[in-house]
Amino acid sequence: MRKFIIRNGNVCDGISDNIVKADVLVENGRIKDIAPDINSEDTIIFDASDRIVAPGFIDAHSHSELRKLTYPENRTKIMQGVTTEVDGHCGISSNCFAFDNDVFKWNSFAEYLELLKQCRPSTNSVFIVGHNDLRRSIMGGKPSVASDDEIKAMQKTFRELLEAGAAGFSSGLTYFPGKFADTREMQAIASILKGTEKIYTSHIRSEGDDLLNALDEALAIAEAGNGRFQFSHMKTMFQRNWHKLDAMLEKIDSAQKKGLDITADRYPYIYSATGLHQILPAPFDKNEKISDFLKESEENRKEVENALKNSPRDLKSTILINYNKTLGELAAEQNVSAEHVAMQCLMENNLQRAAYLAMSDANLQKIIDLPYVAAGSDGISSQLDNENDFVHPRAAGTFPLFFRMAAKTSGIADAIRKMTSLPAQIYRIPERGVLRKDYFADIVIFDADNFNSQAGFDGRNQFPSGIDKVFVNGRLAYDHTDPQNIGRHGEYIPIC
């Protein structure tokens, strides 16, 4: 299918406020014309009457770099209308460095890209270099600040990855080993961004009690680069910090007026999801191998269990994603404390995943309404049909929910802008995110009235309704009349 017409759709180009009735002609992977009543011989016709025709959605914050190899169909994203994912956030980008597990092995970013090409994922890929893996490639898991020589080595590696097409630099300063980095280290690495249009993105050092100081640090790091900052999953964690949103936005507004280019992404949920180790208070939050520590002695287990009484998180409402139950529910079933269940889970698995109820509905809507906030799932691709593959519902529900929340305030066209041209502009993704002549034909056809999430923590983590068809690089990737047949036409998009 190299030539086709999408007929009689309500075309929203992703950048303007207008939605117009028109046809879209696609040939050889690119948009050739957008106009009423296009005629072309020997052309397949797709009827889009009463449907929105929009640019394929761009997931501004994704973590699918490894799952694309094991699960290239990527149904959780393609069936939401996502055609491009920006991976490598929160300092996590093992694809950019030597990697070896039971399934895959590569020695460089170039080897990973060759493997990705062989796997043929359904979505396009843009990659960011993650600080945690960059640091680990030079320093291992060393729990200390970097030396001058180590910083120079990280700078050299980072520069090479930018030259290979990486879109920027990400950090996750609450995670290992990034949490051991000081601001000086981060600024030195970010300085390699100078002279490029590439961005610094961050899961900042604190999203709760020390939020405002953490934002100051992030802005200082961005300023040491090229003055561009993407605030990852912008939020205010824990009820005691919800009131800080206005002060946070004032800081951002002030920095923007001084010339910094600040944008953000957000998923439309008040539950976050990350490792269960995030419940650990000091000093145990510095121990990357907490599982081994707990296995060493009963004394260690009691010490951690007692410390968990001072956890910064609400343990009883914390959902263990692999069990699809809260710590409180599991504690009641076992007639023990939530702290005891949490300690046992940490002992069993350093990588236990959890979801935390810590955010405000009102703040969520206010953040999504900001003109510079793009849709970002913070999710991985998932099979969903695997009973052991539990994920946060944002993996399958972000885009329909974000669309509904954004459209409620600013209308359909602006909601689509935040899911298409805005993330394309943030990451400097060329010739995508807008329906325009000669641009790549990444296109979604959907029913705006019935575009709804069906994902939840209750086991109903299902695909959304309302998506009719998705095209990636001018080829059909998803058709709702044949949902099992996923076209795998995604490509790596280097950012120059």
PLM region spans:
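Hydrophobic, small-residue-rich alpha-helical packing segments that form membrane-like cores
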Residues: 90-97, 101-224
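Acidic, glycine-enriched loop/beta-strand segments at the rims
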Residues: 12-23, 328, 353-364, 412-416, ...
